[in-house]
Regions:
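Glycine-rich nucleophile elbow surrounding the catalytic serine of serine-hydrolase chemistry
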Residues: 1-8
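Short loop/helix-cap segments at secondary-structure boundaries that form the rim of catalytic
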Residues: 8-10, 97-98, 112-120
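Flexible "cap/lid" loop of the alpha/beta hydrolase fold
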Residues: 12-47
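Conserved beta-strand scaffold positions in the cores of enzyme catalytic domains, especially
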Residues: 16, 102-104, 120-123
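Short aromatic-enriched loop/helix-cap "lid" or pocket-rim segments at secondary-structure transitions
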Residues: 28-32, 114-118, 135
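Conserved alpha/beta-hydrolase catalytic His-Asp/Glu region
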Residues: 48-96
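Short beta-strand/loop motif that positions the catalytic acidic residue
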Residues: 104-106, 110
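Catalytic active-site module of serine/aspartate enzymes centered on a nucleophile-bearing elbow/loop
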Residues: 121-150
Length: 150
């Protein structure tokens, strides 16, 4: 979501649709905002990323064990260097406000970017950070309309 918003600044777009993301640094969870000030994010023990089941349970909640193989495919970027870079980019993102053409779809149960920090979004009840996988029916029913409407 953040990357596509940055790309929209250097190319002409009609709309940007982000899912399970944030539109500005103000929507980041308080811990991420504090981490920027303290630089605590630099000391995260990212080696635990190889313990895939723990990672999945942390990010998506304990009810996901049945879907481990699907999440393994979805979370293919588990390289420690990539994660350090990505966390640094997210925590230090400077965007203060979003563009009018951004459509934000967000789950009410997202643990990575909790919905209490999210403003002006289409909320998917029960959706978590991986709702693009778990709520396929909702996306199949609603995305075509969101893409084509004015």
């Amino acid at each position: 979501g953040i990357i596509v918003q940055e790309l929209s600044k250097i190319t002409v777009v009609k709309k940007v649709i982000i899912i399970s993301s944030v539109k500005s640094r103000h929507e980041l969870p308080l811990m991420m905002q504090l981490s920027k000030k303290t630089k605590a994010y630099k000391y995260l023990p990212l080696h635990w990323i190889d313990d895939f089941e723990s990672l999945v349970v942390f990010v998506f909640g304990p009810m996901v064990k049945k879907r481990i193989s699907l999440y393994r495919k979805y979370l293919s970027f588990r390289d420690e260097n990539y994660l350090k870079w990505a966390i640094h980019q997210i925590v230090n993102w400077e965007q203060n406000k979003h563009d009018k053409y951004t459509i934000h779809i967000h789950g009410t149960h997202d643990l990575v970017f909790p919905s209490i920090y999210i403003k002006n979004a289409i909320f998917v009840n029960g959706g978590n950070h991986a709702m693009i996988l778990r709520k396929a029916t909702w996306f199949n029913e609603n995305l075509p309309r969101l893409i084509t409407q004015g």
